[in-house]
């Protein structure tokens, strides 16, 4: 078996994927296996009893939103009795930031990979709620539920109608341009969100709707510097899924956290998760909060690093250090270090500060274990209690043991 050839095949599929944002649809209509009593979440599999505060809160909010329960107590009883199922977004071609909770009637972005060569595939992500009290951080007040209903009845349909007129938005091209404008695609999405708004605005203006709804949607998108994060995550999911299931490949195709555990998936080991307790991110905190308030790492957004952006592209986004900590030199060094554990330089994602060198892409579990260098991840930091919200942002690395577990499983499977 030629491992290098397998890895070359996998990383080529990842880089040559061409994810197009083509529409918005109800989760139950498009996500494989979705049904009314299934709640999807970020990270590897987890039972209700082990869920951290933010994830529990988001699950309660989703049950209230779906009217599976009418009070917090009813939602908790339903969860404890097994009346609802909890499964990872990743196992349903889906990703979501922070808690990542996605339920049947929620509208989701549809991202179709339309590569020039190779097989197409599709990925999904929920819509971004903006800032403040939001479901993804475990809030479930009436204010949160009202915003979710507005997103389902106004925001989603309006954006969906605009996308139907667009012929699709090329997200690979959008990400590539944003990297040349100071974004890294995970914690800093200011340029990408403006490019997203620029593409949508003329089309939204043509959508028929209630008086004022177009301007309401444009303001909501314009005020949210994370508006493009969810489509970008779905794009990265489409890219990494294109590389999943290559026999003999040692490349990582998912890194995901549920607030309790950190899990990875490996291309040549389909159907398996390798997990260990998630670390607590270290970074800068908003006024009034400290490291003691932080929940362990949570969210599917590390799919960005898995695809070669985010923490792997920090050299493109020196200003991010004002948010996650460190200096511009640290941002540059973070990217340089990641070349040590990856198999390729991205053909389409390049960084001006490194003479337009391609971002480090294709995490190789062999290199991670051999060198003792774990991937770098930029991340928001959630409060450990449900509903408090984001309390800061910083950096985190996966526990090394999961790469060791994966390498041992690989050796066993392939008789090495």
Report each predicted region and the residues it spans.
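Anaerobic metallocofactor- and corrinoid-dependent redox/one-carbon enzyme cores
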Residues: 1-416
């Amino acid at each position: 078996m030629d491992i290098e050839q397998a890895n070359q095949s996998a990383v080529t599929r990842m880089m040559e994927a061409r994810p197009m944002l083509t529409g918005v649809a109800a989760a139950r209509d498009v996500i494989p296996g979705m049904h009314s009593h299934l709640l999807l979440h970020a990270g590897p599999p987890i039972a209700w009893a082990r869920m951290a505060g933010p994830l529990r809160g988001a699950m309660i909010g989703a049950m209230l939103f779906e009217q599976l329960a009418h009070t917090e107590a009813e939602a908790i009883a339903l969860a404890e009795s097994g009346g609802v199922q909890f499964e990872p977004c990743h196992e349903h071609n889906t990703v979501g930031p922070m808690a990542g909770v996605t339920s049947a009637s929620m509208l989701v972005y549809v991202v179709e990979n339309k590569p020039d060569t190779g097989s197409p595939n599709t990925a999904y992500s929920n819509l971004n709620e903006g800032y403040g009290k939001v479901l993804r951080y475990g809030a479930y007040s009436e204010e949160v539920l009202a915003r979710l209903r507005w997103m389902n009845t106004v925001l989603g349909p309006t954006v969906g109608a605009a996308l139907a007129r667009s012929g699709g938005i090329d997200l690979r091209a959008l990400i590539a341009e944003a990297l040349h404008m100071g974004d890294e695609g995970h914690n800093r999405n200011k340029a990408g969100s403006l490019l997203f708004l620029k593409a949508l605005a003329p089309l939204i203006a043509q959508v028929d709707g209630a008086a004022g709804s177009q301007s309401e949607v444009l303001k909501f998108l314009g005020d949210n510097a994370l508006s493009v994060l969810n489509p970008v995550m779905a794009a990265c999911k489409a890219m990494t899924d294109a590389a999943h299931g290559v026999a003999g490949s040692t490349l990582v195709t998912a890194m995901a956290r549920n607030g309790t555990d950190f899990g990875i998936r490996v291309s040549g080991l389909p159907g398996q998760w390798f997990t260990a307790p998630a670390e607590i991110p270290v970074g800068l905190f908003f006024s009034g909060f400290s490291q003691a308030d932080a929940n362990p790492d949570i969210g599917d957004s590390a799919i960005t690093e898995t695809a070669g952006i985010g923490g792997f592209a920090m050299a493109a986004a020196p200003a991010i250090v004002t948010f996650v900590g460190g200096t511009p030199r640290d941002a540059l060094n973070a990217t340089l270090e990641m070349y040590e554990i990856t198999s390729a330089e991205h053909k389409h994602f390049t960084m001006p500060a490194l003479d337009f060198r391609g971002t480090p892409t294709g995490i190789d579990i062999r290199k991670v274990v051999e060198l003792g260098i774990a991937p770098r991840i930029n991340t928001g930091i959630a409060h450990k209690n449900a509903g408090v919200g984001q309390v800061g942002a910083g950096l985190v690395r996966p526990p090394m043991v999961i790469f060791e577990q994966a390498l041992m499983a690989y050796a066993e499977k392939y008789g090495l």
